[in-house]
Amino acid sequence: MRIFFASSDVIALEVLKKISDQYDVVGVLTAPDKPSGRGLSLKVNDIKREALSRKITVLQPVVLDADVINLVKSLEPELMLVFSYGKIFKQEFLDIFPVGCINIHPSLLPKYRGPSPIQTAILNGDSISGITVQKMTLEMDSGNILAQSQFEIKSFNTSVDIFEYVSLNSFDLVIEALNKLLKGDIGIVQDKNNATYCSFLGKEHRTIDFKLSAFDIKNKINAYNPWPLARARLDNNEIIFHRADFISTNDYDDQVIGKIIAFDPSKGLLVKTGDGILVVLELQRIGKKVLDCVSFYHGNRDLIGKVFS
């Protein structure tokens, strides 16, 4: 089968490698190179780099216009596989592929349609999430489900960990979905009454409000790693939080919210919140390395009693 692959994210790299080993990948659609670093030199993403190493045609259009459509048609693809590409496809584009178009989405659809399902699942304190391969339609993430698996979120620490799991465990579902398509199996229709949505995460979401519960703050910190990275201020300096846990307790209720009340080498840096104790495990000063709580504390022994804002 001649497959056209669309992705702009490293999460799809393992799928691209495996699908290229077993099928004829005739083209890869990915985002344009972006300026990076002080010199603003153009940075090649991992998807493009892998495709070029395999001598696969790479397309990086800003707009999916008629010229792009004609170019894709000239590759004579039979099926499109999409995994975190970043743009919405019009029907004219979807119609290029006679076998159809399938998409890998890291949630248990119809839950969390949209661009941030992994982060949103952690943020909301969900106990399970999953991976879905769906047949693509014009409406975002609303196509028939061809393959699906689930996992327990408690097995992971942060969004980074789940990204890695999804990256390594999506290919078998793709094969299951392809086999169903080729047999004429239309899959399972999503129940639109159970559909929920998630949105893009930006810098405006990253500030920690210590008046919230320790449970909610812990979820935010772990959800927002690697992006947009939750943060707060300490001594007029911005501190980035990379990983956290929490303790449900009524102790320290007389302490100021946001106060660093103790350091426990077996737990972490303990911070008073609106409900319970936030246990900070990994953090970072702007421009410095990410440190575990022990290393951070040993370099900042005057932390106890200070207040995050």
From Swiss-Prot:
GO cellular component entries: cytosol
**Entry binding sites for (6S)-5,6,7,8-tetrahydrofolate:** 107-110
Q: What is this enzyme's class at the first EC digit?
A: transferase
**What InterPro entries would the database entry show?**
Fmt, Formyl_trans_C, Formyl_trans_C_sf, Formyl_transf_N, Formyl_transf_N_sf, Formyl_transferase-like_C_sf, Met-tRNA-FMT_C, Met-tRNA-FMT_N
The record lists the catalysed reaction(s) as: L-methionyl-tRNA(fMet) + (6R)-10-formyltetrahydrofolate = N-formyl-L-methionyl-tRNA(fMet) + (6S)-5,6,7,8-tetrahydrofolate + H(+)
* Keyword set includes Transferase: yes
Q: What is its EC number?
A: 2.1.2.9
Which Pfam family is an annotated match for this chain, by its short name? Formyl_trans_C
Per UniProt, the keywords (alphabetical) are:
Protein biosynthesis, Transferase
Q: Return one GO MF term.
A: methionyl-tRNA formyltransferase activity
Do you know which NCBIfam families this protein is assigned to? fmt
- What family classification does the UniProt entry report for this protein? Belongs to the Fmt family.
Its biological purpose is as follows: Attaches a formyl group to the free amino group of methionyl-tRNA(fMet). The formyl group appears to play a dual role in the initiator identity of N-formylmethionyl-tRNA by promoting its recognition by IF2 and preventing the misappropriation of this tRNA by the elongation apparatus.
Q: What is this protein called?
A: Methionyl-tRNA formyltransferase
Q: What is the organism field in this record?
A: Borrelia duttonii (strain Ly)
Q: Its gene?
A: fmt
